[in-house]
Every structure is written in C-alpha cells, then in structure tokens.
Amino acid sequence: MKLKKSPIDVFDNWAKTGKDDGLEKNHASAVSKMVEYSTSALEKFSFIDAGCGNGWLVRNLSNDSRCIKAVGIDGSRRMIKKAKKLDGKNEYVCSDLLNWKPGEKVNLVISMEVFYYFENPEKLTHHIYQSWLTQNSRLIIGIDFYKENLISHSWPEDTGVSIMKLFSENEWKEFFINSNFTNVRSWRVDQRKDWEGTLIITGEKL
C-alpha cells in the first residue's frame, strides 16, 4: 500500500510540476455556470475564492467590471506563490481556510473541488458563514467527488490523497442548512455517460 499524502502536499507538487495548469481547463465549464448563477442579479460584488489554486478564477473574475474586490486563499504555499507571480493586482493568502478570517467580509464565496479535502466540511461551511460573509451574501461550491458520482469513488486510492470525505448530495445540503444558510439548493451540471456531473450546492446568508 502506498503512503498517502495530505491534500496540501499533493497540490504543492501539482504547482511544482505544472499539473495545476489543467485545473482551469477541467473546471472552467462548471465554474462559469456557478459564477453566472451567483452574479447575474448583482450590480457589484466582492468575492473570495476558497481554495484558489494558482488563482485562475480570481484573475478571470476580477476583470468583471462589477467586481470591486477579489481575494484568493489556498493552503498550498507553491500555489499561492504561483498565483502572485501571475497576478500582481489581486490579493492572495496562504493559510488554513479553517483558521483564516478576511480583513473585510465579502458578499460572495466561490469554491471548486475543495470542501471534501477537509475532515469536517460542515465546520468550514459554518466558519465561512460566520467570518467571511456579509449580510445578503452567498456561498456556492462545486464538487465532483460525491456518493452519487460512482466513478469518483476510487479517487482517494487513485490520487494517494489522505483526506477525501465522501458524502451524498443531501448530506452536503445538510451541512449548509446546519450552518444557518437559507434558500439552500443543489443541482448538477455537465453530466454525461458514467459521470453524474459537478454537484453544485449554494445557500444565502440573509
């Protein structure tokens, strides 16, 4: 049995080897749908990308004329170093998401393929509700690793990542509801044969 690595160690290595360059390509379709859903009715917004990787979403979305502030946070030192190298305009922070608090709260938090790398994702959901978001704000996340997406179940072994928590769509919604989010809903995008699609979960802080 091969020794498993922490998610941060794995993504540090991705940044080192250039494997992170595929993140935008692989996730752009689902993330664009999340962004459209989250921002279509907003005249302006400030946002945090939770688990920003090399900063591709922060770079792209900060160019939206309605975006007044964009912050990327990630636990991987190499990812943040790369993000800062590629983008001198926006703010990037290397920190544990569970411990970090922004200097200024935002009205949108987006996260793609991050939450299941935490031992207790509900704890992170609650922390974001309490410490990151203003009133009248939204958290929206996308995940590909969930119970209904059967093909993803082998990923912990395939990738050698030590923490990957597998939950159902309803369990993910419960995490949001238990963290006091309202108007919680979920749906799936980009489904195809043998692939249930990216699961999107969102809720509002009113």
Regions found by a protein language model. Name each.
Residues 144-163:
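Short, glycine-/aromatic-enriched active-site segment of Class I SAM-dependent methyltransferases
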Residues 122-136:
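A short glycine-rich, Lys/Arg-flanked "PGG" loop and its adjoining helix->strand segment in the class I
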Residues 164-180:
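Short alpha-helix
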